[in-house]
A protein has these predicted regions:
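Mature-chain termini and adjacent capping regions
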Residues: 1-381
Length: 381
């Protein structure tokens, strides 16, 4: 009977062998089984109990190894049906992927393995774990096709999505459909329709529209950002956003608009070398510049390259080459080609630098650092 079984297995796939030995990874060891108990045979089917299968490449290196409680071959011996599956994927004799599932099926000479029912795939190289109800494993392509809702877990990141792919060679997870990625420290949540996670590089790329929400330790939202594209470096806590960016902060209550932003979501510091607008809706203050940086924790904004500040409540405008704004106190310091004008009383000042506060129209403009520039009052009715 055992000789007949070996003959049938080799006809199915010369690279698949029955091995009564231990399997590494998903189970630390497999008890030795009496060969006589391994095989039962109906008229048209071969059934293996507590069996181990493995496939090797032309260089005789093990590609994968699978253990199942029961293995039933189809009538033509082209498909193997598996029950209670654990297995490993190898590269250079090292385990690079561990899998387990309630059920499975081996097709296409061992090049396609379908797994179903609480499928768990873990990569010991990076500590990531993916779970789903259905995964297609293609060992020769170094690919997992995740066809149903999935959850990915990493020491500092969790992701969920409708479907995805995991490229085992490069340790990259691509997911799509209702993507949510949550970072634990600092607390950050990303939502998108598509996401690429390069795990060894600790990099996340959202090639489409994305929303980032930052939380404090009390799970209160501090910042919300949207853009057309985003890239995150999880090690540096740095997000790089492109096109149609809007940042809304709750403390202080500001709205930022630009087309490019580098955002340290740990330190809450944003910087850009593109035109930027900062809007304080409560106080009706607007600042625009050709580049700038804002530090929300210190409540300091610095704009350069041609700056315009408007306080609509006080009906005043301030123009400068560079400007620093203390968001809390409304103190401003500006330099270069200063123009300050107000409506009540009507005045216009020019000079090289300016300092003061917007909330009480108290702005001092100087020229060459010493000479006070005289106000020009227009009394024309």
């Amino acid at each position: 009977m055992l000789g007949l079984f070996k003959s049938v297995v080799y006809q199915l796939n010369t690279l698949i062998l029955l091995l009564p030995l231990a399997i590494a990874g998903c189970q630390s060891s497999t008890p030795e089984v009496d060969p006589a108990s391994l095989v039962s045979r109906n008229d048209t089917q071969l059934v293996l109990n507590n069996a181990v299968l493995e496939q090797s490449n032309p260089q005789s290196n093990t590609v994968w190894k699978i253990k199942a409680d029961n293995i039933t071959y189809s009538d033509n011996n082209q498909v193997a049906i598996l029950d209670k599956v654990v297995g490993n994927l190898f590269e250079d004799d090292l385990v690079i992927l561990k899998i387990s599932a309630e059920a499975g099926k081996i097709e296409n000479n061992g090049n396609v393995i379908l797994l179903n029912g609480t499928v768990i795939a873990s990569d010991p190289r990076n500590g990531s774990v993916v779970t789903s109800e259905s995964i297609e494993w293609r060992p020769q392509e170094d690919l997992l096709l995740i066809k149903e809702k999935l959850e990915g877990i990493h020491p500092n990141l969790e992701v969920t999505a409708g479907q995805g792919k995991y490229f085992t060679k490069i340790e990259k997870l691509e997911i799509e459909d209702d993507v949510i990625a949550t970072s634990k420290q600092p607390p950050l949540q990303l939502t998108s329709d598509r996401l690429e996670w390069n795990i060894p590089q600790s990099q996340i790329v959202s090639p489409g529209a994305v929303e980032l929400v930052r939380y404090d330790q009390n799970k209160t939202i501090t910042d919300r950002l949207v853009s057309d594209r985003a890239e995150l470096n999880l090690t540096q806590n740095l997000a790089t956003l492109n096109q149609n960016i809007e940042l809304i902060s709750s403390s202080p209550t500001l709205q930022i608009a630009t087309d490019f932003l580098t955002w340290n979501y740990q330190e809450r510091i944003g910087s850009t070398d593109r035109p930027i607008q900062i809007l304080d809706r409560d106080r009706q203050i607007s600042l625009t510049g050709n580049q700038g940086e804002i530090d929300f924790l210190r409540q300091i904004a610095k704009l350069q390259g041609g700056v315009k500040g408007i306080d609509r409540q006080k009906a005043l405008e301030l123009y400068a080459r560079n400007l620093t704004w203390n968001i809390d106190t409304e103190k401003v310091e500006a330099e270069g080609n200063i123009i300050y004008q107000q409506t009540e009383p009507k005045a216009r000042l020019t000079g090289d630098s300016a300092i003061g506060t917007l909330k009480n129209n108290n702005i001092t403009v100087t020229s060459n650092g010493t000479q006070q520039v005289t106000s020009i009052i227009d009394d024309t009715p």
